[in-house]
Amino acid sequence: MHFSSYQDLRSSLLAGQTTCEEVTKSYLERIDRHCDDNIFLAVFHEQALSRARSLDRRFSEGGTPGLLFGMPMAIKDNISIKGARLTCASRILENYESVYDATVIERLLNEDAVFIGKTNMDEFAMGSSNENSAFGPVANPFDKTRVPGGSSGGSAAAVAAGLALVALGSDTGGSVRQPAGFCDIVGLKPTYGRISRYGLVAFASSFDQIGVLARNSDDAALVLGVMAGADERDATSSRHAVSNYAEEMAAVSPDGLKIGVPKEFFHESLNPDVARLVKAKLEELREKGAELVDITLPASDYAIAAYYILVTAEASSNLARFDGARYGYRSPNCDNLSAMYVNSRTEGFGKEVKRRIMLGTYVLSAGYYDTYYKKAQQVRRVFQDRYREALEKVDVIAGPTSPFPPFGIGDKMDDPLEMYLADVFTVPASIVGMPAISVPIGYDSLNLPVGMHLICNFFEEGKLLGIAGLMQHSIV
């Protein structure tokens, strides 16, 4: 049983051609057949089937189906579901069980979604390949010797492999968009504050945003509409009115659309196949009536440096709570309080997490705060000003999602700087807080997926999804 979109699934459910239980069982069986790909850290066999039966029973009794009636969804394992393990793919939280639902979980349940499992990820969302998980790497469904991207690699792989119709991820610097590009699906990071972060385990609080991974922009828009909106439990959530995304998407046309193309995104190090596919897609849109506008985004070379200074500083603070005293892993090798703190964190955290904590502690230290952290914040403001100015002249900024296609498992693990460059095109949207999306545009010479990255102005998710839909529809 396979559905290419939620609309197809919903039509079958409402027509009585299938049931929520049959659909859920089909997805769970497929997950079991793909267990060697290490996509899921937990599968909710009994809970998912029980919920599906409950939805079927209510529908048969005349109940009104919710907007996501029967939608099989996978959830990244840094989002809280009451009664389920919440590991963040880390040994330090290996046996921790969440005691509450995240706001997004509550809202999805209220619209009759079915959660089928928690997906693998880079530990505490720190990584670009899903190789930093304490529970092993995830295989890319297109080539199991290659990475699916990260940190939401499990969620992206689940959707790409047909193990979930839609999945949730979190995006700090590209962790939804980059794996979407590597797995040939749509990955949306909304405007910062569009979706409540209550119940999302924090990596870098001024960057983190829950995002959506789906096979098409229509499904992404539907789920976004359910989750979006202010939340009194998250002071950073925005009270900006939630749009009718379907209407805004329908209003988008290639005719007269102004697409900004930054020269900084097409440098010599860009993979030739990626450059060719992106330019071909832009030319295709130009032929349909869009206008390609050459733009420049000064300071782009500083994006990665500023980003890693800021997010590691925030991570060093956020992860201080994992100390072995209150919850999570506690080292047995300690005879005093200080040893408990040190040993629990040393044994519980992985290599990349410890690297980022140490870097963040360093840039926040008294002698280096002004030299690094303060300057990075100033660069962030420059980026916000430059992107705001650019989007006053164009409707969308377009470029590659990643400088290269999916790489082999283990290829970049010994070179963290090279790994960080995987996010060079996605980081700017996170720095400024604007909505961004990766949309599949074709395949390279090795038949590996390539994605295009789009950025719109604050709270223009409807326009962004509409443009993504134009691009994706033209390759189907």
UniProtKB/Swiss-Prot annotation:
It is an enzyme of class 6 (ligase). Its EC number is 6.3.5.7. The active site is at K76, S151, S175. It catalyses: L-glutamyl-tRNA(Gln) + L-glutamine + ATP + H2O = L-glutaminyl-tRNA(Gln) + L-glutamate + ADP + phosphate + H(+). InterPro entries: Amidase, Amidase_CS, Amidase_dom, AS_sf, GatA. One of its GO terms (molecular function) is glutaminyl-tRNA synthase (glutamine-hydrolyzing) activity. The keyword Phosphoprotein does not apply. Pfam families: Amidase (PF01425). Gene3D superfamilies: Amidase signature (AS) domain. Keywords: ATP-binding, Ligase, Nucleotide-binding, Protein biosynthesis. GO terms for cellular component: glutamyl-tRNA(Gln) amidotransferase complex. Allows the formation of correctly charged Gln-tRNA(Gln) through the transamidation of misacylated Glu-tRNA(Gln) in organisms which lack glutaminyl-tRNA synthetase. The reaction takes place in the presence of glutamine and ATP through an activated gamma-phospho-Glu-tRNA(Gln). Heterotrimer of A, B and C subunits. Belongs to the amidase family. GatA subfamily. NCBIfam families: gatA. This is Glutamyl-tRNA(Gln) amidotransferase subunit A. The gene is gatA.
